[in-house]
């Protein structure tokens, strides 16, 4: 399955929810879903009855798009979550939250997960003192993510860090802004994930 390269705002309208795919734009009145809250397309404003399967599918697609994950990898994450102790749906969200690119985004080094993924791939960070370029790497408690010295003058990163107060940092992470460093204080819990996600619908979809 190819990665989506079309307009990001169209995806938010399709899912009927803010996915925060466009960085700072998503926090302004320019956000597409704030201006047009109905789905895109000729029949977007029409009322369409959606089946239970359709509701489950849309929820899965929404979460995939929030984190920028392709279907095969997302299915793999679900299978891993299903083998773990605890609640499968919550385990899935924890796996997604612990991705290195998501942690870089959550700490404020980037205004979107896609931007954070690019920063990781281009080698802008170290993890526990070692250069890292794998966006899907899973962090653990005690890990330290730091921006490399030569990357600290990148304007986009500095501007993103300035806006981190508005976006907020989850309690399981800690940012030392002046040191361009973030620490994983603990593993995320369900309360840390404030996006409107109904993970049980995804469990029901994959359990069919």
From Swiss-Prot:
Domain S4 RNA-binding positions: 98-159
One GO term (biological process): translation
Organism superkingdom: Bacteria
CC per GO annotation: small ribosomal subunit
UniProt KW keywords: Ribonucleoprotein, Ribosomal protein, RNA-binding, rRNA-binding
Keyword rRNA-binding in record: yes
Record has tRNA-binding as a keyword: no
Molecular functions per Gene Ontology: rRNA binding; structural constituent of ribosome
Pfam (any one): S4
Subunit structure: Part of the 30S ribosomal subunit. Contacts protein S5. The interaction surface between S4 and S5 is involved in control of translational fidelity.
Similarity section: Belongs to the universal ribosomal protein uS4 family.
Function of the protein: One of the primary rRNA binding proteins, it binds directly to 16S rRNA where it nucleates assembly of the body of the 30S subunit. With S5 and S12 plays an important role in translational accuracy.
Identification of the protein by name: Small ribosomal subunit protein uS4
Upper lineage: Bacteria, Pseudomonadati, Thermodesulfobacteriota, Desulfuromonadia, Geobacterales
Gene: rpsD
């Amino acid at each position: 399955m190819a990665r989506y390269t079309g307009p990001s705002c169209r995806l938010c309208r399709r899912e009927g929810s803010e996915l925060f795919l466009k960085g700072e734009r998503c926090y302004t009145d320019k956000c597409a879903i704030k201006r047009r809250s109905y789905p895109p397309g000729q029949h977007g404003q029409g009322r369409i009855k959606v089946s239970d399967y359709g509701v489950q599918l849309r929820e899965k697609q929404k979460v995939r798009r929030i984190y920028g994950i392709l279907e095969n990898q997302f299915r793999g994450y679900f299978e891993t979550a299903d083998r773990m102790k605890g609640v499968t749906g919550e385990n899935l969200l924890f796996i997604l939250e612990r991705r290195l690119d998501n942690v870089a985004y959550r700490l404020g080094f980037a205004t979107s997960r896609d931007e954070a993924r690019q920063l990781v791939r281009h080698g802008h960070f170290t993890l526990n003192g070692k250069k890292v370029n794998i966006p899907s790497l899973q962090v653990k408690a005690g890990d330290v993510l730091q921006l490399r010295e030569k990357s600290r003058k990148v304007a986009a990163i500095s501007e993103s860090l300035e806006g981190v107060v508005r976006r907020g940092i989850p309690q399981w992470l800690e940012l030392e802004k002046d040191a361009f460093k973030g620490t994983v204080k603990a593993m995320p819990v369900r309360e840390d994930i404030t996006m409107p996600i109904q993970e049980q619908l995804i469990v029901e979809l994959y359990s069919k």
